[in-house]
């Protein structure tokens, strides 16, 4: 049930006091880092949220809070201005016992905090933790109310949180944010219910957290990855400090070496389109993906143990040891029309240099050819480069080299946690429980293990200034203050090189398939390949997948002593149905049509980084008035370089943070403004975040056309041994058609 402060403040005060006095008190099992004491929490689920309107005048473009809502236990309290929130917040602080706290969840803490910061700084900000300036995870006020960001902690939207943890479900649809509402704007009951609904969900989430995260040895983590870290630490048991000390001794002595490896050696998943098939509407495409790609790499391969020690460049790859090297490649040329080396990881190239570099050919952000180019690689990636590229061995120079003590399997405390969750996930799926909360938790933990191994050192230090601004800490000269390298590695308990090697192994497996079957593979995306089915090469690919799977199952049988729940780990799984239509436009940009057994019909899906699912189909219907399923040729022709999604369909928003002094040198100002009903009202404008709808442009920067021309120019001047490869490829396509594009 909800209550408005402006109408029922006396009743609200009585209810809050009554609920707090009756509530159970629970003690956190982990000491507070600042106070060194165990925090006590009032066991009442709580949530906070604001509703805002954009305010545009001749001078200002800002936003205004016209409604706030705060839930506590089974009740929701609301108000129509930040002035009333001030009164409410001051009262609730006064009723919390001095040694207790309220845990309050927020669905977008950075956003809501910025509107309220001028009001919060009247009290002490007793604790705060943030990943970046705009991304606080914890804001604690006066040692009494702990605001916690919930979306990052649980790794899902508020709607999904409601679905997974709460009785109350997110209401479908949104408030019409184009309507300007102010504090005196009458709200319809459905609008009030929308406000009420979100904080109800947050309160129920709080109840779930108290039941599941405040046991004898449990504590609420900051993020989902933090929870995994706790699982691994528990697996270490009494050896935790011993293991942690050893791992920290493996960190590079030289801080610059660590940052060099972190910036240039660590690479993400491999994604891309076969350049000769980019922007082509293709038929009958098969899809296969690795089962739990990263977890399989963690189980199947060996990893660096010990500290990277700088050694002679002559030692690179001289023994069966892990190596890292900075290598300047000479006359580097891809053996196929696929490119695997990212231009962003080239150490000697700036973005500006790339634009005017005639001796380098860029294929959609990746290096296809370069006269000279420098990369930081490990021994696994070097083997992949040798597989995918030709280069002049004699002129290629190893600039620097590091070696590790040995290769070894990942330690038991990692693999035990990973494999326990993988087995649980597989067992639940086999028993038809893949829609359960238990399955989701297990799957998230399996997928999160890789992320935990490649977490960067936390170096930044932030402060909250007198205006409530979260900002980087700076010294007297204005230079940004960061934690020292030696201080930062005190929190390390896993080798950062394990994560770097996991991605190298994952990429190498994909590269192996791409290089062996370059003509029929159309698209690849981290752990999957899309390939044509109408050629002899595709038949050989299917045979190779079958052979690979047999070998993979034999390895699993050996590692897991015949446990059938692990038999498919790392195997390639083929989709049951072909994609009747497919088109690729580069990394993370493709669209396809495929039969879906759940829908019992064909579905059209697009995967475009930064674009909401279903957006392209909505825009197509809006622009053409046609149904996608009935106009496939027109739809796939519509999906092309230069496609624009307008503001109404993109649902993308840009954020502008109103700085201090924005209002003619002041931090706040009173103005008269009209709501959507033309009701005039005097409002106070202060700190705010302005959300502006923006369009989405899908541009490929003319790389497609330029690259084809480059291929033709290179082909005409190629050595004979290279020409043979290209002749085999070119024979598979209608070359004149490519030139016409």
Each language-model region and where it sits:
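Conserved RNase H-like, two-metal-ion catalytic cores of nucleic-acid enzymes
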Residues: 2-104, 115-137, 258, 263-281, ...
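Conserved catalytic palm subdomain of right-hand nucleotidyl-transferase polymerases, strongest
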Residues: 48, 148, 280-294, 442-446
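A residue-level signal for conserved active-site and pocket-lining positions in enzyme catalytic cores
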Residues: 49, 105, 149, 198, ...
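A short acidic (Asp/Glu
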Residues: 56-60, 113-120, 205-206, 231-235, ...
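Conserved DEDDh/DEDDy metal-dependent 3′-5′ exonuclease domain
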Residues: 74-183, 194-197, 201
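Short beta-strand
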Residues: 130, 520-525
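Acidic, Mg2+-coordinating catalytic module of metal-dependent nucleases/exonucleases
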Residues: 160-244, 510
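C-terminal, non-catalytic extensions of nucleic-acid polymerases
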Residues: 210-277, 306, 333-522, 531-741
């Amino acid at each position: 049930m909800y209550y408005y402060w402006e109408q029922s403040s006396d009743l609200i005060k009585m209810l809050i006091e009554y609920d707090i006095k009756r509530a159970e008190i629970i003690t956190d099992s982990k000491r507070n880092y600042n106070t060194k004491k165990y925090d006590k929490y009032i066991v009442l689920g709580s949530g906070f949220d604001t509703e805002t309107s954009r305010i545009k005048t001749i001078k200002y473009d800002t936003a205004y809070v016209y409604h706030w809502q705060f839930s506590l236990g089974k009740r929701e309290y609301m108000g129509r201005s930040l002035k009333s929130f001030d009164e409410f917040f001051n009262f609730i602080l006064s009723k919390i016992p001095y040694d207790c706290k309220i845990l309050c969840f927020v669905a977008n803490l950075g956003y809501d905090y910025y509107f309220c910061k001028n009001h919060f700084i009247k009290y002490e900000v007793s604790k705060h933790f943030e990943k970046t300036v705009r991304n606080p995870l914890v804001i604690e006020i006066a040692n009494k109310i702990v605001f916690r960001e919930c979306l990052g902690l649980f790794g899902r939207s508020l709607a999904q949180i409601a679905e997974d943890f709460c009785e109350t479900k997110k209401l479908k649809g949104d408030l019409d944010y184009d309507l300007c509402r102010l504090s005196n704007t009458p709200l319809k009951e459905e609008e009030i219910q929308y406000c009420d609904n979100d904080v109800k969900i947050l309160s129920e989430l709080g109840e779930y957290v108290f039941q599941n995260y405040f046991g004898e040895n449990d504590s609420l983590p900051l993020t989902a990855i933090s929870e995994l870290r706790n699982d691994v630490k528990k697996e270490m048991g009494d050896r935790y400090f011993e293991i942690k000390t050893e791992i920290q001794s493996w960190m590079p002595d030289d801080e610059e070496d660590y940052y060099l490896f972190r910036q240039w050696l660590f690479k993400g998943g491999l994604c891309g389109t076969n350049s000769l098939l980019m922007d082509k509407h293709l038929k009958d495409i098969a899809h296969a993906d690795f089962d739990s790609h990263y977890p399989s790499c963690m189980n199947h391969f060996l990893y660096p143990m010990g500290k990277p020690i700088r050694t002679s460049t002559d030692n690179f790859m001289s023994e069966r040891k892990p190596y890292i090297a900075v290598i300047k490649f000479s006359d580097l040329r891809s053996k196929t029309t696929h490119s695997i080396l990212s231009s962003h990881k080239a150490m000697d190239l700036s973005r500006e240099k790339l634009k005017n570099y005639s001796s380098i050919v860029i294929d959609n952000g990746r290096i296809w050819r370069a006269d000279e180019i420098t990369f930081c690689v490990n021994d696994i990636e070097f083997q992949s480069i040798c597989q995918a590229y030709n280069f002049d061995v004699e002129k290629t120079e190893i600039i620097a080299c590091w070696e590790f003590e040995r290769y070894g399997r990942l330690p038991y405390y990692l693999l035990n946690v990973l494999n326990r969750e993988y087995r649980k996930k597989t067992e639940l799926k086999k028993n038809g429980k893949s829609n359960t909360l238990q399955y989701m938790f297990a799957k998230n933990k399996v997928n999160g293990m890789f992320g935990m191994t490649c977490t960067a050192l936390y170096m930044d230090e932030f402060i909250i200034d007198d205006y409530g601004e979260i900002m980087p800490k700076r010294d007297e000269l204005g230079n940004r203050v960061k934690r020292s390298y030696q201080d930062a590695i005190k929190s390390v308990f896993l080798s950062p090189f394990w994560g770097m090697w996991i991605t190298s192994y994952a990429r190498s497996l994909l590269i192996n398939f791409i290089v062996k079957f370059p003509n029929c593979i159309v698209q690849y995306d981290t752990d999957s390949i899309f390939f044509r089915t109408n050629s002899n090469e595709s038949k050989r690919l299917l045979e190779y997948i079958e052979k690979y799977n047999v070998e993979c199952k034999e390895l699993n049988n050996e590692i897991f002593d015949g446990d059938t729940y692990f038999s498919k780990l790392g195997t390639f799984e083929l989709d049951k149905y072909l994609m009747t239509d497919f088109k690729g436009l580069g990394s993370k940009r493709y669209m396809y049509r495929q039969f879906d057994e759940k829908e019992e019909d064909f579905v059209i899906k697009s995967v475009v980084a930064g674009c909401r699912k279903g957006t392209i189909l909505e825009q197509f219907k809006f622009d053409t008035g046609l149904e996608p399923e009935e106009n496939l040729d027109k739809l796939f022709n519509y999906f092309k370089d230069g496609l624009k999604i307008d503001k109404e369909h993109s649902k993308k928003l840009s954020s502008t943070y109103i700085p201090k002094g924005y209002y003619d040198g002041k931090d706040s100002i009173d103005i008269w403004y009209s709501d959507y009903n033309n009701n005039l009202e005097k409002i106070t404008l202060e700190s705010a975040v302005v959300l502006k709808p923006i369009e989405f442009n899908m541009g490929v920067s003319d790389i497609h056309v330029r690259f084809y021309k480059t291929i033709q120019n290179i082909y005409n001047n190629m050595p004979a041994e290279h020409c043979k490869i290209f002749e085999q490829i070119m024979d598979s396509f209608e070359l004149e058609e490519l030139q016409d594009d």
